[in-house]
Amino acid sequence: MAAGFANLSTSMPLNESEAIVLRTYPFRESDLLVTLFTRTEGKVRGVARAAKKSRRRFGGALEPLTYIKVAYEDRERQELARLDSCEVLESPLTTEVSYPRAVALGHVAELLDELLPDREANDAVFRLALSVLACLRGDEFRIPLTYFELWMARLMGYLPDLSACLNCGRTLNGSRAYFHALADGLMCPEHKRLASSEISAESRRLADQMLRLPLSRLEVPQKSAPDLSKFVLQTLERHIEKKLVTRTMLERLK
C-alpha cells in the first residue's frame, strides 16, 4: 500500500515528517484536500494532486487515521501545501473496520482536528494519538477513547480540578459529585446546579489512574465510565463552542 517517494518538483525544498491523516475532502476535479497532523509542524492542510484520478501515487496512504511519512512543499503566499509523496507506516485498514470501530476512529480524528491549532507542533499529543490508535484494533473502544478525551482535555489546558467543588472548594474524595454543561468543574451535593449530572467516585478514581498510567498499563474496569466521558466531552465542547458530531454517533452505539 505504500507509495514511493517520487518528487514531482525541486523548485522548493520539501518538508518531511511523520503524520497522521485526519480528513480528506474532494477538491477540484481530481484532487483531494487533506488535513494532516504532522509531528514536526502540527496540523497542516494540503492538496494531493490527482489523488482521485489515480491511486498509484498515494496508494492507501490518505485513508483517515493512517500513520504515514509525508513529503510536502509549502508555497509562498499560499495557505495550502502541496503533498509530494506519502509512505504508509501503519494503517487502520490492516484489521477489519466495523462500524463501531469506524466511529471510534472518526472520534479521534475529529478531536484532533477541532482542538489543535494550525502549524503548531505538539509531540505529546502526537504520541498520545499513536498510543490510542494502537489500542483501537477491535470493537472494545470505550476506555481507550475516554483515555484519549481526558488527556486531550489536560494537554489543551481545559481539564478542571477533579478533587474539589468548584463553588466551595470542599474536597470531594469519595463523596458524591456533579457536573453541568455550563460549569467548569465538579460540584458537591450542596452546591450543584439544577439539571446537573452525577459522576461516580469510581469514575473519578479511573480518571486519576488514567492521568498517572500509560494506556497499556491501565487496569481496564468492568464498566466503561460513560459519566466520565460525558463530563470531559462537555468540557471540550464548551471550550471549542460547538457540538462534536461523533459524540452523538458514539451515544447511538450504546
What does each model-identified segment do?
Residues G4-K254:
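Non-catalytic alpha-helical scaffolds and adjoining flexible linkers that form interface surfaces
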